[in-house]
């Protein structure tokens, strides 16, 4: 078998782009909480001392946007100018208009209803935009996620945990992780390299304090957790690089501007699967960029959980204002246990991929999105993450004749 290295990265909740994602989704949640039919497209730009929120919203709800922005920044941990940003004193600028009526007419009354006269209630809502979305699953981890992004997210989450609980009190909110795994064919066999970069206080020695603390309190506990989860991976002699550029005192929005939607590979599968290009945060579920990508994860995960394939990638495509998808494609990378066309037919039979049906089946009109905005939208089996359920396994197996 051919050996290869594959790398994925993650970032902490204090990374500037992730701050922007979390702000956008916090605003979305506030609007959905009061008006579940809210149409929301909110973008956030954050830079030194300033947050700018812009977008289009149609809603009956009221949200104190400036206060929501400040509260989220403080919750993340930026509460002092010494850390490069202070949510209590930063400027907040808001420029929000209403959704274009040209877009609204296609979402409110789909092509099937408007032109073809279809009376099906689920055909009344059209896709909020054209586009293509991918979902992916693989059996290399218990959550059916690729191992490199799975471990990278676990490391970045723990990096924030040890900062917040005081285990490593001199850490600051901004941070990144990166994991390189060696594969033998399609099987993950060895951990090659871990990179951890974390913002820190000014009086810290990297070699005698930061690097040993990161190894002891961040990396090693997560490697043990892999074993506890039944993941067999050779970790002896892996390379650990901690802050390889040197000191990392200036971080967060002072170090780099942040923008909603700039971490779409981190949000999904770490580069292991294809991506249609649409970001998630700040968008209500009428936007298929988000809801259909969640549905495709649901589909792919159920295919793998059903034992129909070891790896599965599913693509769906929509035309703006039309309810039915214009395309569905399934790739199993030679791992299918039944004929590939049977899997595609089973998906079309078992899953209704019209936007209104996705919203109904995954219960997406709830204020659940702020918790998706850091550490990955997929692979975290939280109660609100309905797209992580494997509730269509039996139906898929029946549909293919197993």
UniProtKB/Swiss-Prot annotation:
Pfam families: S-AdoMet_synt_C, S-AdoMet_synt_M, S-AdoMet_synt_N. It is an enzyme of class 2 (transferase). Pathway: Amino-acid biosynthesis; S-adenosyl-L-methionine biosynthesis; S-adenosyl-L-methionine from L-methionine: step 1/1. Keywords: ATP-binding, Cytoplasm, Magnesium, Metal-binding, Nucleotide-binding, One-carbon metabolism, Potassium, Transferase. Binds 2 divalent ions per subunit. Residues 99-109 are annotated as: Flexible loop. It is found in: Cytoplasm. Its cofactor is Mg(2+); K(+). It catalyses: L-methionine + ATP + H2O = S-adenosyl-L-methionine + phosphate + diphosphate. GO terms for molecular function: ATP binding; magnesium ion binding; methionine adenosyltransferase activity. L-methionine binds at residues 56, 99, 256, 287. ATP binds at residues 15, 174-176, 247-248, 256, 262-263, 279, 283. One of its GO terms (biological process) is one-carbon metabolic process. Mg(2+) binds at residue 17. Homotetramer; dimer of dimers. NCBIfam families: metK. Catalyzes the formation of S-adenosylmethionine (AdoMet) from methionine and ATP. The overall synthetic reaction is composed of two sequential steps, AdoMet formation and the subsequent tripolyphosphate hydrolysis which occurs prior to release of AdoMet from the enzyme. This is S-adenosylmethionine synthase. It comes from Streptomyces avermitilis (strain ATCC 31267 / DSM 46492 / JCM 5070 / NBRC 14893 / NCIMB 12804 / NRRL 8165 / MA-4680). The lineage of its organism: Bacteria, Bacillati, Actinomycetota, Actinomycetes, Kitasatosporales.
